[in-house]
Amino acid sequence: MPIQVLPPQLANQIAAGEVVERPASVVKELVENSLDAGATRIDIDIERGGAKLIRIRDNGCGIKKDELALALARHATSKIASLDDLEAIISLGFRGEALASISSVSRLTLTSRTAEQQEAWQAYAEGRDMDVTVKPAAHPVGTTLEVLDLFYNTPARRKFLRTEKTEFNHIDEIIRRIALARFDVTINLSHNGKIVRQYRAVPEGGQKERRLGAICGTAFLEQALAIEWQHGDLTLRGWVADPNHTTPALAEIQYCYVNGRMMRDRLINHAIRQACEDKLGADQQPAFVLYLEIDPHQVDVNVHPAKHEVRFHQSRLVHDFIYQGVLSVLQQQLETPLPLDDEPQPAPRPIPENRVAAGRNHFAEPAVREPVAPRYTPAPASGSRPAAPWPNAQPGYQKQQGEVYRQLLQTPAPMQKPKAPEPQEPALAANSQSFGRVLTIVHSDCALLERDGNISLLALPVAERWLRQVQLTPGEAPVCAQPLLIPLRLKVSGEEKSALEKAQSALAELGIDFQSDAQHVTIRAVPLPLRQQNLQILIPELIGYLAKQSVFEPGNIAQWIARNLMSEHAQWSMAQAITLLADVERLCPQLVKTPPGGLLQSVDLHPAIKALKDE
């Protein structure tokens, strides 16, 4: 058989094999087109599970008469025009294949009208060459698509359709997912002339939990913990069910969205599962409805024709971001308030760059948020309950080991640095455990502090280094090892391999897990403070340091690592400084009582005050 160009209908039918799997696939593509058109109301009529009829009517912007024929052509779209558009796609559709593919395996009719037109127009394609016919019609502003007799001309595909009930259940599930993505759109679904679902739009700032409860059920709503988590261009919001009360029915609720697009992403699911693993049984699954917002340039949605999958350019960053966001809410929910002193103490884990932006809790009475000034009291992240301020930081009151991203030790031990200050008595006055309030940032890396009328300067990089050393130093139990998404394999010399084997037990206490063979070592896990570091540089330097040592003490290794970690902040902000000091005050209370050299320097204002008075 000679090489020849396929007829348009056959080419479209082949493409339909990827795009149009079943009636639910048709509904998904058409409803997404309606959303891209700006519709605020979408009516969906289904007959016989979608095999007989699928009708989608919307009140979107409509399609102009002279573009109707193009709308049914392959690779015709109004959503992108260049590679730059594709690399920053924000619309749900963009491939220009859906309508052509659907019309090649069904009897499709497209009726539309724009606000500028006086009348509506109807288009349909037929014949081997898929010629489009356009004629006048009666229709309000918006678009209606009718898909009749799906797979009527491809019997092999039609016989693979399941029962009417099964196919409609798939459609119902698709609509549930879309309704969770767009709270601002009214969606009505009917089957065989009977209204089955009515999802009314929620006004801006309205009670989204109403639709959440209607879609996911009251059982999920009662256990839902609200999430609002942000870092740079990444934002995670939504709800995750309390894993301590997860049931098999709740475990079926697993919805995730990337920039408003519903996804089935293994990386996202793995991050959520890993965050919940300490609280879930081996046969349990987490329940969640989560929305990830990311810079469109950092995600590739052009992976599969059905657009079910995405690729992240920085997959490890996204994984760890979701991991930490979910875990922070789960741990906050577990916190139990204890009797407090007269003054509130810092919260357990202030969320970096997200404290003020933390979302309101829709599932409990709103907590009163104290302002940052005149005294630091961090705003809680949103969760299922108002978070109580953390009680006085005492060695005997810490969370259980295994809180993967909290990197807290069960009993913070004194830092094993030769010149470290002696630990103080557990019961400290409230004021003695605070550096004071942050007034401003000086020279990009120093915090100007005020406490009891006294002014001082604190070196933020030094405080960060001390904090990391405490986080890395094992207490009664080893530091938690966090598995690397992609293990790091390095070539080592015989001397380096010997040093690693001698230091293996000490490294294990620090949360560093590796496996060695003849000439290589594979780093499989590291503690949390190392996850965001450039391990390709840090680990070889650590191996070189170990090769020069004769004694391998975890405290000394932790001290070396803390001194060689790169700071995450070249330019410190007020929020970052406040977060750091809250962690230091909680984990290293001895530093507040007896600051080591290079950390804190008092500023004498008396000469300046005297000079002003002498003027």
Swiss-Prot record:
One of its GO terms (molecular function) is mismatched DNA binding. GO terms for biological process: mismatch repair. It comes from Escherichia coli O157:H7 (strain EC4115 / EHEC). It comes from the Bacteria. Residues 363-397 are annotated as: Disordered. Keywords: DNA damage, DNA repair. InterPro entries: DNA_mismatch_repair_CS, DNA_mismatch_repair_MutL, DNA_mismatch_S5_2-like, HATPase_C_sf, MutL/Mlh/PMS, MutL/Mlh/Pms-like, MutL_C, MutL_C_dimsub. PROSITE patterns: DNA_MISMATCH_REPAIR_1 (PS00058). The keyword NADP does not apply. GO terms for cellular component: mismatch repair complex. HAMAP family: DNA_mis_repair. This is DNA mismatch repair protein MutL.
